[in-house]
């Protein structure tokens, strides 16, 4: 579901609009909930609700009330798989205890009687997200990309160094067998969504099975760490205000996280198809190469990155499966 969320809750430069028909919130119930949780003082206050125009995996709204701005995240009605609001809230709540780049969460409700689905309330994140639209409005000088790419990497390294036990997140995943499960599960997902007989897909699945690392570290990982989930300060490329989209955060191999990130990192020398798939600024002159990103990661962690070809190929395969799933739904 990475691509279904590529413009999900970019809470900064995402277009906000009136709430779409059929996706309205029960404002009376919501205001009672906000007051009970100390987020507003009066139920009579006007609740200005806007909906973020993008986002298909989960629905995201902005609440403007009593000079405060909140964001509410909820799944679409009827959604089950991949929309665990409680898990996402607990991950963010834990991260709030020791990682200052995750959005602050204020309250969670698993009661369907309030607005029809479980939901949680989080802070409204401000700053700048580097998207194609943003680049059209404000060109970034080539000389800035070295700073930008270093700044972008810092929170990912910090996340991989966190102690999940101290944050109360040690049960957020099953570290043993993580790589094996990922390879197996993404292979299964591809086969379920296959529409054509693509021999290369079978070759890649076999290669991934045969080239898995025997040993690997475990840490908290984001699992979708890319430019449109990174909120920079509006005033400085050396500061990141927040990292978004934590619904796939788990405990796993940190190099899986890095591999997915560099899979999204298209370069000017890449084939046209690969560059067309990722409309990020990574191929613009001034950006480091994927190899340079890996070297930066090694320098920051103080540890060598081994078997990176496996992790990069897995990242590309995972993205290809997501594209195939989208095509499968379209083709039906």
Residue positions per predicted region:
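Catalytic-loop of the protein kinase fold
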Residues: 220-222, 227
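Activation of the activation-loop gatekeeper triad in protein kinase-fold domains
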Residues: 244-249
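ATP-binding pocket architecture of kinase catalytic cores
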Residues: 47-203, 207, 211-220, 234-238
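Juxta-kinase regulatory segment immediately upstream of eukaryotic protein kinase catalytic domains
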Residues: 12-42
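Active-site activation/catalytic loop segments of kinase-like enzymes and analogous catalytic loops
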Residues: 256-301, 315-331
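All-alpha amphipathic helical-bundle segments outside canonical DNA-binding/catalytic cores
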Residues: 173-174, 304-315
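N-terminal mitochondrial targeting presequences
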Residues: 1-9, 15
């Amino acid at each position: 579901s990475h691509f279904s969320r590529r413009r999900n809750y970019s809470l900064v430069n995402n277009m906000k609009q009136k709430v779409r028909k059929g996706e309205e919130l029960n404002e009376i119930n919501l205001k009672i909930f906000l007051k009970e949780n100390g987020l507003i003082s009066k139920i009579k206050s006007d609740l200005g609700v806007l909906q973020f125009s993008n986002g298909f995996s989960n629905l995201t709204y902005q609440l403007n009330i009593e000079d405060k701005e909140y964001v509410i995240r909820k799944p679409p009605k009827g959604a089950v798989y991949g929309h665990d609001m409680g898990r996402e809230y607990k991950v963010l709540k834990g991260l709030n205890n020791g990682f200052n780049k995750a959005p602050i969460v204020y309250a969670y409700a698993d009661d369907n009687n309030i607005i029809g689905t479980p939901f949680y309330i989080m802070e409204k994140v401000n700053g700048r997200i580097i998207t194609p639209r943003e680049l059209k409005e404000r060109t970034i000088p080539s000389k800035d990309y070295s700073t930008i790419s270093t700044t972008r990497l810092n929170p990912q390294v910090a996340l991989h160094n966190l102690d999940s036990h101290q944050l109360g997140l040690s049960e957020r995943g099953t570290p043993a067998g993580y790589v094996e499960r990922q390879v197996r599960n993404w292979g299964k997902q591809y086969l379920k969504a296959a529409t054509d007989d693509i021999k290369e897909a079978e070759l890649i699945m076999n290669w991934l099975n045969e080239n898995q690392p025997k040993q690997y570290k475990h840490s908290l990982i984001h699992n979708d760490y890319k430019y449109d989930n990174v909120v920079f300060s509006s005033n400085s490329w050396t500061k990141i205000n927040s990292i978004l989209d934590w619904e796939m955060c788990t405990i796993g191999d940190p190099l899986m996280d890095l591999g997915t990130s560099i899979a999204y990192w298209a370069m000017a020398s890449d084939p046209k198809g690969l560059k067309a798939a990722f409309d990020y600024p990574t191929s613009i002159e001034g950006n480091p190469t994927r190899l340079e990103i890996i070297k930066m990661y090694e320098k920051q962690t103080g540890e060598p990155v081994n078997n990176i070809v496996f992790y990069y190929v897995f990242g590309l395969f995972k993205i290809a499966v997501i594209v195939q799933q989208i095509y499968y739904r379209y083709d039906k």
